[in-house]
A protein has these predicted regions:
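Structured alpha/beta reader/binder surfaces that contact nucleic acids or chromatin modification marks
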Residues: 2-198
């Protein structure tokens, strides 16, 4: 999918990241700030925007690949397929490209995936993962959108039909300065964030 420029401002964006619904719920509840990602089937890798993006919940493969004990309590039944509920957005504080599987266990306190699902994701196509440190924001009023067939498929990023306002919303959880230092202690210096399509 081609990600179009010019659809994000300081107050609104149409860019959205697809993620398992249980992980999205955990992020917006303050349970986690870390995602472990791989690009979709048609993507060369995982690109990272510098600006805000919506957290777009999906249910594909969630039950099969699994969330850990902290994440499992956020799993909800799949809603009607003709709507999507958007409850929050995020920015990326830092990203890391991880090539060493020995670094997976030290990350377990900060993400919501089972060890088996992380290892499967790491080994898919080529051994690597992108580690994301997010700053999530919860909308005061969630937005329900009609589903769009263009959102289907195995890709990480999509655009909503139109930009949605980012406010009113509030930051979820404590500041991530300490967590970033902890992750840098495991993974080293963070990567330079690049936009999708770069």
């Amino acid at each position: 999918m081609i990600l179009l420029p010019g659809q994000t401002t300081d107050s609104a964006t149409s860019l959205a990241l697809k993620e398992w619904s249980g992980v999205v719920e955990g992020l917006l509840a303050g349970e986690s700030r870390v995602l472990l990602r791989k690009g979709g089937i048609a993507e060369k890798g995982f690109a990272c925007p510098g600006g805000p993006f919506w957290l777009f919940p999906t249910w594909s493969h969630q039950q099969e690949q699994g969330l850990n004990n902290r994440g499992a309590r956020f799993i909800r039944p799949c809603p009607l397929a003709d709507t999507v509920r958007i409850a929050g957005w995020a920015t990326m504080e830092a990203t890391w490209t991880m090539l060493d599987p020995a670094l997976l266990p030290p990350l377990e306190p900060w993400h919501l995936l089972t060890r088996a699902s992380v290892e499967k994701r790491f080994q898919y196509r080529h051994p690597a993962l992108t580690v994301l440190l997010l700053r999530p924001y919860l909308l005061e009023q969630p937005v329900t959108l009609p589903a769009d067939p263009a959102w289907d498929g195995c890709h990480s990023w999509l655009h909503l039909q139109a930009p949605l306002p980012l406010q009113p919303a509030h930051f979820v959880g404590p500041d991530c300065g300490g967590l970033r230092k902890a992750l840098e202690g495991i993974l080293g210096p963070s990567d330079k964030i690049k936009p999708p399509g770069a």
